[in-house]
Amino acid sequence: MQAVGRRDPIFRAIEAMTALAEIFERRREVLARDAGVTPEQWRVLEEISTEHFIPSMFARSRDSSAAAVSKILRQLLDSSLVSAAIGRADRRNRRYKLTAKGNKVLDALRGSRQAAIEAIWTGFSREELAAFSMFATKLSDRIERYSRGKSARRAAAVR
């Protein structure tokens, strides 16, 4: 296997993807901040809006702790963006729902995101978008396979 140098197309592609990921993260932070929430609170608001929100499952899907999700929920409750009620079927659980204020914030976030999508993405041709999507999917799949293989090898080495 040959070493990858700084001028290599692979290295340049990695730099470009890293820059893209950082830009996406910064944009998400700006959109959230402009709406008065954090990116994490935005994710929870989006999930609550689906009406299938279960805090423990959300924490697991985000590789987060239940305590971290509880903290975000308390912040959203304190900000009057969500309300909580005891579950009908299982009184040990709470049902979370967006308040009118929470819906307004989420609508503003979605509107800002849609405006950004239209301003940035609509200038690309269908072919460019299809090629990018195909490449991104292949790259994601390869990274996932590599990560699973590494985890399996690490687990086997521990046994």
Model segments located where?
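A structural signal for well-ordered alpha-helices, especially hydrophobic packing surfaces
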Residues: 21, 106, 140-144
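Anionic, Ser/Thr-rich low-complexity intrinsically disordered regions
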Residues: 7, 13-16, 35, 39, ...
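Charged, amphipathic alpha-helical coiled-coil/dimerization segments
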Residues: 25, 75-137
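C-terminal regulatory/oligomerization modules of transcriptional regulators
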Residues: 1-5, 126-159
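N-terminal leader segment of winged-helix/HTH proteins
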Residues: 1-35, 100
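Active-site phosphate/pyrophosphate-handling residues
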Residues: 15, 43, 130
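N-terminal helix-turn-helix DNA-binding core of bacterial DNA-binding proteins
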Residues: 26-68, 79, 151, 157
